[in-house]
């Protein structure tokens, strides 16, 4: 009787160990995926920042060209 109880206990302990091992493997996979996603987010943020800077530069260039065009148009009106 005690031997059967011991075998059942041993089986439950082994099952718990197997479950823990699987969960640890899943945790490692999720950590790797999380790291990968974090890198993707960082890259996306860097790309966004670059695009914002480029957009600002293009807006400034557009303003310069608009001022030049206004100047030329005002000179044409004077003629």
From Swiss-Prot:
Gene3D superfamilies: 1.20.5.340. Keywords: Cell cycle, Cell division, Coiled coil, Cytoplasm, Septation. Its main location: cytoplasm. It is found in: Cytoplasm. InterPro entries: Cell_div_ZapB. GO terms for cellular component: cytoplasm. One of its GO terms (biological process) is FtsZ-dependent cytokinesis. It comes from the Bacteria. It holds the Pfam family ZapB. The keyword Cell cycle applies. Residues 4-78 form a coiled coil. Belongs to the ZapB family. Non-essential, abundant cell division factor that is required for proper Z-ring formation. It is recruited early to the divisome by direct interaction with FtsZ, stimulating Z-ring assembly and thereby promoting cell division earlier in the cell cycle. Its recruitment to the Z-ring requires functional FtsA or ZipA. Homodimer. The ends of the coiled-coil dimer bind to each other, forming polymers. Interacts with FtsZ. This is Cell division protein ZapB. It comes from Sodalis glossinidius (strain morsitans).
């Amino acid at each position: 009787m005690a031997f059967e109880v011991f075998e059942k206990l041993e089986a439950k302990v082994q099952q718990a160990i197997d479950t823990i091992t699987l969960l640890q493997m899943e945790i490692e996979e999720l950590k790797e995926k999380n790291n990968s996603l974090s890198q993707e987010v960082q890259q996306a943020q860097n790309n966004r920042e670059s695009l914002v800077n480029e957009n600002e530069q293009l807006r400034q260039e557009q303003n310069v060209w608009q001022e030049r065009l206004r100047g030329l148009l005002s000179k044409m009106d004077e003629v």
